[in-house]
Amino acid sequence: MGLNLKTTTGKVIASLALVGTAAGVAGLGTYGAFTSSTSASAAVGSGTVNIALGASGATNRLSVAATNIVPGDTIQRVATLTNAAGNQNLSAITLTAAATTSSKLDTDATNGLQVVVDKCSTTWTEAGTAPAYTYTCSGTTTQVLATRAVVGANLALANLSSLTAGNTDNLRVTLTLPTAADNTFQGLNSVVGFTFTGTQRTATNQ
């Protein structure tokens, strides 16, 4: 009998211990807790990098063709280049001139077409009869691209106000066929496209 009592008592004690543990765990869940939280949201918007040539007309003569040129002739064309207010400032603006229709006029780097780009601090004064335009500057003329062969990629442009948003540059692009161009340049045709590319300013903390 004694053995049986001990066994029974052991089972009861074990059961009570389990029940007690369960009750203890359940009791933990009934305690209250004070909490406080706060939050904030950050609005993030991206800027705009955008430069634009002027519309056709006196603010963009680049698409006006020149024909019947001979050695020594020059071709002057103007265009405005604008970085509108509200856009981002730029770290650089480059020019790529590529021939979509090619000939020796653009492939001969020495005796083919040469280009130079300058700008006027005010609007260029236009004279001449289309397409033989000429331009004078009543303000200050500044070099943007030194004389070189017409075709080139990612050519660095200097002294541009349009690096800063809200500014416009009054550009003049002048093409010249050197006097050294010989008879092999007769009867040729080239179409040269000019692409201006603006690069975003240096990244910074915002």
Where are these regions (language model features)?
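Signature of Gram-negative chaperone-usher
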Residues: 2-15, 29-34, 58, 113-172, ...
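A generic structural signal for short beta-strands and their flanking turns/coil linkers
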Residues: 47, 58, 75-77, 111
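C-terminal, structured domain-capping segment
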Residues: 70-99, 157-206
